[in-house]
């Protein structure tokens, strides 16, 4: 049973909006605005610089927290992705736009706008900084209200986190497409009841009979924000445009429509959103998280110009199997050393040369051959 990955869109800039308003800062629209807000938070609120995960950008295509994809996208670059340029697919980590981005990130690191300790931080460490009010701005996907922001609200109910969609290309926000599937549920041969997998998936994700005696148990599971990894089967099976569907389904219910014929997963979130809107000042952090993620963030995706760039290849070639691990290590080391100043920006050219010589050119050829062969096969 494959997991069907949804289109999660680009990362948002999540901001302590109570701090922003207190300091009379304009709502962020560009990366320049992002940096000005971080500078102000550092100066007047004693906050850390912009937090970043050392992976810097997404690999398989998933949006994740604390990543700097938007900076690369602003230079028309999508690291770790195979992007078509001038008729052939290229590994975008070696694109000249990456060099430009790394140079700028080095400047931010040197200034402290990019957290000086990001090379040493773990995700748990970053979450602690957020929860205890030492961080007021992060990049993250639509779901970060569920983790870690919900815990920040529990710790300090006066914290008002708000998502903003940052423009990377004129009036649009660009991001790359995701791998269609990356996880699978397998059942051993001879297992007595393999159909139970499909039944569980149907209960969690499909349309649900709302007169069933156990429906409240399932709905409550979502309403109290149980972590998805606690599910009996820890995969998502949904439409690619599930976020759009969820936003419109919940919006319909909030506007008075019946919850019948609405996907089961959306109904408890709609209830949580209703509860939040009924009393914003005295409400649970979980209700806020449902509204901030499912209405505020997803609403921004629907109401703004969001452009998806196609990632052309997600499989594995013969040379990738042997050498890609080493090339990824080379890439990570080069990126982090340039940002931190251990290597000059010009080292990027040495990295690209080494990447090509140590298997990158061969992999590029293999990727393009596979893509061409698939295109030819689809034409016959």
Region spans (language model):
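Substrate-binding rim/cap in mid-to-C-terminal beta-strand-loop elements of soluble/periplasmic
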Residues: 170-177, 185-188
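Histidine-centered catalytic/metal-binding microenvironments
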Residues: 333-380
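Short, solvent-exposed loop/beta-turn-alpha elements that line the ligand-binding surface or hinge
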Residues: 79-96, 169-174, 231-253, 372-380
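Helix-loop-helix "hinge/cap" segment bordering the ligand-binding cleft or interdomain interface
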Residues: 1-66, 83-129, 134, 139-141, ...
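Conserved small-residue motifs centered on glycine
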Residues: 206-333, 342
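A ubiquitous short alpha-helical element
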Residues: 3, 88-92, 313-322, 337
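Ligand-binding "clamshell"
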Residues: 148-169
